[in-house]
Each structure stands twice: as structure tokens, then as C-alpha cells.
Regions:
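Conserved AMP-binding/adenylation subdomain of ANL enzymes
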Residues: 131-148, 155-235, 244, 269
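Short hydrophobic alpha-helices that are characteristic scaffold elements of the AMP-binding
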Residues: 14-20, 42, 166-170, 207, ...
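Conserved AMP-binding A3 loop
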Residues: 108-134
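Conserved pre-ATP/AMP-binding loop-to-beta segment of ANL
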Residues: 93-112, 119, 142-148
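Conserved ATP-binding loop and adjacent catalytic segment of the adenylate-forming AMP-binding
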Residues: 176-178, 244-250, 257-296
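Conserved AMP-binding/adenylate-forming
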Residues: 1-33
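ANL superfamily adenylate-forming
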Residues: 54-104, 210-239
């Protein structure tokens, strides 16, 4: 089981589990102790990796309550107290020469979702489903090695796992991570992603951030002036760190067409996508990313 906010070590651990022929169980870093313990117990996990966390108390509680569980701490001050340290294991380990065979129907990961009611449900996801979803994404979006990704949505969520982890690993795309929530916007500006996917809530917050600085009536007036129109659009994109983004995406929850229309009016075309955990996130997508095709 892996409980951590997004970081490079998350990727390394997931790859290590694949190469070691283990099944990964990603858990949201905001999960409470009861949820973590349930997922660990239900999945019959033999180890728990704790990493970058806003509050390690819940993870620490599970580790302390389950002494039979192997625990490994990633190299962050906010990680829980564990039996083993990630850096020490890397330094002392002898790389295995064995390479397990991963067939399409072989179980890769158990991803727990809230479901519609009751306890979390574990979706059994295979290597074949992962490979297919990522390859479709790479083909449809045209992901290239010179693209840049920014990973901040929880990697325990299937969307981020496919879009970010899959694209970076199978597409060879460099990926950056936010230092913290407080530095989020500055981190995006520094990295200038060419592909950026988000959720309706964050796109709404971005809109509010813009409107707080530039009221809608004033924005509407400025957008009607031909020369100023292009300048305003450029400045807004730069203010969000998205002026180099060639694909903007939205998924994971319903989004208002009015919000998408608003972004289109300021020169940012957001592509909708829909999928489920059970389908490894990739089911439908607006293609070829046309703002006049909202909802199709």
C-alpha cells in the first residue's frame, strides 16, 4: 500500500512494485485511519509506504496498530515513523536480475473508490487495461517527449495515474510536482506545462482568481477591443502558467458548460474527458479538442 502526496518517489515505488511482481494499492493521502486500515486489511497488503503528507497521524496510527505490517518511509519530514527508510533501502539493495512477465490479464493494482455507498470498493486493474488506456491517451493527444507534465491531483485517483504516471513512463515526458499548496501557482508558472488536466473545482477557483483581479464587466469590455483582446488573453494565460499549454483537460466530476464557455472566451480551450476507475479512466474525450463541441 502506498500513502503519499505526489512526488518522484511515488513513481519509483510504483515501478518497483511492478518490477518486483507485486500488486500496488494506492491510498489517498487525505484518508483517515479507518479507511487506510480497511484498504490495507482488505487488500491483504504486506507493506505500507508512507510519504509526503500534510498530516501523518492517520498513517502513523495504522502502522502502530499493525506491527506485522512492513513500513517504509519516503524521504520527507512529514512522513510517518517507519521500520525502514527509502534512501537506506536504495543504498543497500542489490538490484534483482529477474524480470517478471506481465500479461494483459495480470493484476497490476487495486484502486479503492468510495462507490455509491458503504465501504470503499477495490477495482481490480490489469496491465493490459493500463497499457491500452495510456496508449490511447498518447495517440489521441499526441503526447511527445518534449511535452511537460505537472502532477498534483492525487495519484491514488485513476485519472492522474493514467494521465501523468502513464504518460511520463510510456511517453518519456518530464514531470514536475508542486512543493506545497501555498506554492502551487508559482510552481505551475515555473514549469510551464504543455499538458494540464484539472477538475471543475480548480478551474472554478482559477476563474475566481482572475475575476477577483479583473471584474467580469471590465474583462468583457477589454475583450471587445481587438488589440487589447489578444494581450489580455496572453496575460491571463501567463498568470496561470498555462501560456504554453497546448491541451487543457477537465474530468473526474461534472463541469458546467458555462465555465467551459467562459474559458473559451479568454482563449483557453478546455477538453472534457470521462471515464471510470473500472475502465482505467479512459473512455470518452472531446476530440479534436474543439470548444464548439462541448458535451459531445
Amino acid at each position: 500500500a502506498l500513502v503519499s502526496k505526489n512526488c518522484a518517489e511515488w513513481f519509483i515505488c510504483d515501478l518497483a512494485m511492478m518490477l518486483g511482481d507485486y500488486v500496488s494499492v494506492p491510498i489517498f493521502p487525505t484518508a483517515g485511519a479507518d479507511t487506510i486500515e480497511y484498504c490495507v486489511t482488505h487488500s491483504e497488503s504486506k507493506a505500507l509506504i508512507g510519504g509526503k503528507l500534510d498530516d501523518p497521524a492517520a498513517t502513523q496510527q495504522v502502522i502502530d496498530a499493525m506491527p506485522e505490517l512492513i513500513s517504509i518511509a519516503l524521504p520527507y519530514d512529514s512522513a510517518p515513523q517507519c521500520q525502514y527508510q527509502f534512501n537506506a533501502l536504495i543504498a543497500d539493495a542489490v538490484p534483482s536480475e529477474e524480470r517478471p512477465q506481465h500479461y494483459d490479464d495480470k493484476l497490476m493494482s487495486l484502486v479503492y473508490t468510495s462507490g455509491t455507498s458503504g465501504l470503499p470498493k477495490g477495482a481490480m486493474l490489469t496491465y493490459g487495461a493500463f497499457s491500452w488506456s495510456v496508449q490511447q491517451l498518447i495517440n489521441h493527444i499526441g503526447i511527445q517527449a518534449n511535452d511537460r507534465l505537472f502532477s498534483y491531483l492525487p495519484l491514488a485517483h485513476i485519472t492522474e495515474r493514467v494521465y501523468i504516471f502513464g504518460s511520463s513512463i510510456m511517453g518519456g515526458v518530464p514531470t514536475a510536482f508542486p512543493e506545497s499548496l501555498d506554492t502551487f501557482i508559482e510552481d505551475v508558472k515555473m514549469h510551464r506545462p504543455t499538458l494540464f488536466i484539472s477538475v471543475p473545482r480548480l478551474w472554478t477557483l482559477f476563474q475566481q482568481r482572475i475575476q477577483d483581479k479583473l471584474p467580469q464587466k471590465k474583462l468583457n469590455f477589454l475583450l471587445k477591443i481587438p488589440f487589447v483582446n489578444s494581450l489580455i488573453k496572453k496575460k491571463l494565460a501567463e498568470g496561470l502558467g498555462l501560456e504554453q499549454a497546448r491541451v487543457l483537460g477537465c474530468g473526474s466530476a461534472p463541469v458546467s458548460p458555462a465555465l467551459l464557455d467562459w474559458y473559451h472566451s479568454v482563449g483557453l480551450n478546455i477538453t472534457e474527458a470521462w471515464g471510470m476507475t473500472e475502465s482505467f479512466a479512459y473512455s470518452t474525450i472531446n476530440y479534436p479538442f474543439r470548444a464548439d463541441k462541448i458535451g459531445t
